[in-house]
């Protein structure tokens, strides 16, 4: 059974909550490769814009060979890389620290997006009401950053992109309790 709302009254319209939901939806449906795109196109997008633990730790983008092996799900040599340690960056313009924030707004699937947005709607309006719009945005982004960094600490060598607002929404849920 999924909740659709809560019983906590709010005193203000949750404009920021609605804006965050709209932003995540627009990014998923307009900016990210379509759900019908190949998984390779989606993976390429995620490797360019999502936080990747090993990149966050080292402060530099993955090499082309490391990203290719991650996108294809094979070893670097099977991906056609003769020198697995190649230092040519896959996404040279990628700002690995900024990706910690941008990854909060990316989602892996429609179910991932809908689940996160449902819980953002249920809990976000109460937090926004309490913290006011600017405080809520700061709290939401801080929750996403802390969750992403927690993921990085749990597996700092991971080359798998971290996406989704689950950490930011978990912070919202915990603050309601």
Predicted segments — roles?
Residues 1-177:
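A detector for small-residue-rich transmembrane helices and their helix-helix packing motifs
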């Amino acid at each position: 059974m999924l909740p659709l709302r809560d019983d906590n009254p709010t005193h203000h319209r949750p404009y920021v909550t609605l804006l965050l939901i709209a932003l995540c939806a627009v990014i998923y449906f307009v900016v990210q490769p379509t759900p019908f795109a190949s998984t390779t196109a989606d993976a390429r997008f995620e490797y360019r814009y999502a936080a990747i633990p090993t990149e966050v730790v080292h402060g530099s983008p993955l090499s082309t060979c490391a990203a290719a092996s991650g996108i294809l799900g094979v070893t670097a040599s099977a991906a056609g890389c003769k020198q697995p340690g190649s230092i040519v960056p896959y996404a040279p313009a990628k700002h690995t620290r900024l990706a910690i924030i941008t990854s909060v707004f990316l989602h892996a699937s429609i179910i991932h997006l809908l689940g996160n947005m449902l819980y953002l709607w249920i809990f976000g309006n109460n937090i926004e009401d309490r913290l006011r719009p600017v405080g809520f945005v700061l709290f939401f982004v801080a929750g996403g950053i802390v969750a992403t960094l927690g993921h990085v600490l749990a597996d700092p060598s991971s080359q798998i992109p971290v996406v989704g607002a689950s950490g930011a929404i978990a912070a919202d849920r915990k603050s309601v309790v």
